[in-house]
Amino acid sequence: MSERVILAYSGGLDTSVAISWIGKETGREVVAVAIDLGQGGEDMEVIRQRALDCGAVEAVVVDARDEFAEGYCLPTIRNNALYMDRYPLVSAISRPLIVKHLVAAAREHGGSIVAHGCTGKGNDQVRFEVGFASLAPDLEVLAPVRDYAWTREKAIAFAEENAIPINVTKRSPFSIDQNVWGRAVETGFLEHLWNAPTKDVYAYTEDPTLNWSTPDEVIVGFERGVPVSIDGKPVSVLGAIEELNARAGAQGVGRLDVVEDRLVGIKSREIYEAPGAMVLITAHTELEHVTLERELGRFKRHTDQRWAELVYDGLWYSPLKAALESFVDKTQEHVTGEIRMVLHGGHIAVNGRRSAESLYDFNLATYDEGDSFDQSAAKGFVYVHGLSSKIASRRDQR
């Protein structure tokens, strides 16, 4: 039997061409694996059949929506993960899950090679290949788009010459990646930093002015850092993301225009849409402000940033990430309560917080009757707190 290549298949141009190219140029069989991460668009059965029509000996569809939400989106929420304080890791968190299922498919279908359709300029090649090296170092990796310098024009020409059944146009301006956590758009005229995004860039969000007269107030409930309810009704993590995608998206919430530092050393402009993600991260962050002790909250802000960097850099399976998550599990013991927000005009405005685990003490905080704060203790505290600065200043003024 010929060697088998297990291909991460999206249904798009590059991976459809890859099926035919691998067969013709290397004589290997291709098993196409398409992962449903809630990306919507084409029916997954249509994508599966396209892989077969392109020459795959087998085509597998994996419904990983709940797994993605519980195992990948949820840690992103609990870590308040925003790379460069902006990007909620839309694509980055999906790659390790795809890697996991490709490795499983290789074991099941007798594959000795795994393949992806990434270019040599992006982060995803790193995420895929570091993931493969971590989970299955025995598997060979094939990256035809990168290793053979495919361009879009070359891929289209190959598709036409070999009657590959896929509808494409050389004028299609954008590169798009999407899943239930969000949508990423790049290339085309967006590569010129002064060009503003046009309406056709967006699909998950409405124009922020469209529903200007009808703001949406929403209450998100958490238990130990896990979103469990919306407006008092129980939801799964996936259900929370999907509902907030719809509601926040209708208010234009979650649009991000970002110039980010890629792992490969270049800067790249990306347009992201992540309405549900931004609402959940905002709500979770706010609940931590209420329930985490000051020093713990201050330190966790550092680990949140480091976790986001590790995931962005393709180190999902790293020991440091695993250690940080053990720390975060401990921090979430008291992150239980509800956050109320108004979604309006592209913005998220928090206007209410309640938690049985709150560290906010009304009697200590109030300036009105009932104040229990012992203000007589403040004078000595201020003296001791500023003593080291006072001594240093006295020395410097000699």
From Swiss-Prot:
Keywords: Amino-acid biosynthesis, Arginine biosynthesis, ATP-binding, Cytoplasm, Ligase, Nucleotide-binding. The keyword Protease does not apply. It is found in: Cytoplasm. Its EC number is 6.3.4.5. GO terms for molecular function: argininosuccinate synthase activity; ATP binding. Homotetramer. PANTHER family: ARGININOSUCCINATE SYNTHASE. This is Argininosuccinate synthase. It comes from Mycobacterium avium (strain 104).
